[in-house]
């Protein structure tokens, strides 16, 4: 379902019609299993901010802000909705998808190929050590963050391109 607005793709390859159903599914997924929240409220809060030519990244940022604006004493669980929306945006930006996250070795290789990490990292750690570190990673725990907690991790601890604003890990 579309309302006639065009959206610029995150990858920069053209435009498509604003797909409200796709947006709704993402917000529903962010609200899934959380008591006292409503996907409709997040969507209503964000709806008036869309314009022709908006990017998918801007839509994601509007949805995150809309959910975070709903956090108050009576509705504290919107902090988890906003966190999930931020997490979805991070994963999409980093890996191009929200699920099927890469093995740690693949991610390190990607970062060394882009000169984010020093290639010397592979002389410091063996494949077995990287595999062992990967075995400790449980991406489902990412969903335990509150919005404030995840925002702090992103702003303070993730490797970022300070000039372009991109996040590398």
Give the role of each language-model region.
Residues 1-169:
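Extended catalytic cores of very large enzyme megasubunits
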């Amino acid at each position: 379902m579309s309302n006639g607005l065009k959206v610029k793709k995150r990858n920069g390859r053209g435009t498509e019609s604003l797909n409200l159903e796709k947006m709704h599914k993402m917000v529903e997924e962010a609200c899934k299993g959380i008591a006292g929240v409503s996907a409709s409220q997040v969507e209503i809060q964000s709806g008036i901010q869309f314009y022709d030519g908006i990017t998918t990244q801007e839509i994601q940022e509007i949805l995150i802000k809309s959910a975070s604006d709903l956090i108050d004493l009576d509705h504290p669980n919107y902090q988890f909705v906003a966190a999930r929306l931020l997490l979805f945006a991070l994963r999409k930006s980093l890996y191009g998808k929200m699920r099927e996250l890469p093995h740690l070795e693949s991610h390190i290789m990607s970062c060394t190929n882009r000169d984010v990490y020093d290639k010397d990292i592979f002389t410091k750690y063996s494949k077995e050590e990287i595999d062992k570190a990967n075995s400790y990673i449980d991406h489902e725990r990412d969903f335990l963050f509150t919005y404030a907690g995840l925002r702090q991790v992103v702003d303070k601890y993730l490797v970022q391109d300070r000039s372009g604003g991109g996040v590398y890990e």
